[in-house]
């Protein structure tokens, strides 16, 4: 698979899977924006990978997702691939999970992914990449 110079946004880039995705796509020559909420881990990514830009972004801020996608699109000069890798768990045992925490998990893990796709696809369609 040739991903050289493909423009990729990876959310949840500071976690284990996200970091592995950044490494793999970086090794394949992609242009990447790595997104997460942990500034120190984002800075570490920036130090390790020369072709990776970093952006701190909180996915629960739904009102800012469209602007975030616009910024990513402008910074990369387009967007070819969106990887919705970010997610949270608050308690692995459902009988202890409060309804409030359940809603927070759904909000970040599902609603944010939906909105990221919605706004990214709009940009991609204009590029004719979808």
Spans of model-derived segments:
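Active-site loop of short-chain dehydrogenase/reductase
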Residues: 6, 78-79, 124-130
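Substrate-binding pocket helix/loop in short-chain dehydrogenase/reductase
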Residues: 93-94, 98-106
């Amino acid at each position: 698979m040739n991903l050289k110079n493909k423009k990729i946004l990876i959310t949840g880039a500071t976690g284990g899977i996200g970091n592995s995705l950044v490494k793999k796509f970086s090794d394949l020559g992609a242009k990447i924006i790595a997104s997460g909420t942990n500034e120190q881990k984002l800075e570490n990514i920036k130090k390790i990978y020369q072709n990776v830009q970093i952006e701190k972004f909180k996915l629960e801020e739904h009102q800012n997702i469209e602007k975030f996608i616009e910024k990513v699109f402008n910074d990369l000069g387009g967007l070819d691939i969106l990887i919705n890798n970010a997610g949270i768990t608050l308690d692995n045992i459902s009988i202890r999970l409060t309804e409030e925490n359940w809603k927070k998990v759904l909000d970040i893990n599902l609603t944010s992914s939906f909105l990221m796709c919605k706004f990214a696809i709009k940009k991609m369609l204009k590029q004719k990449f979808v």
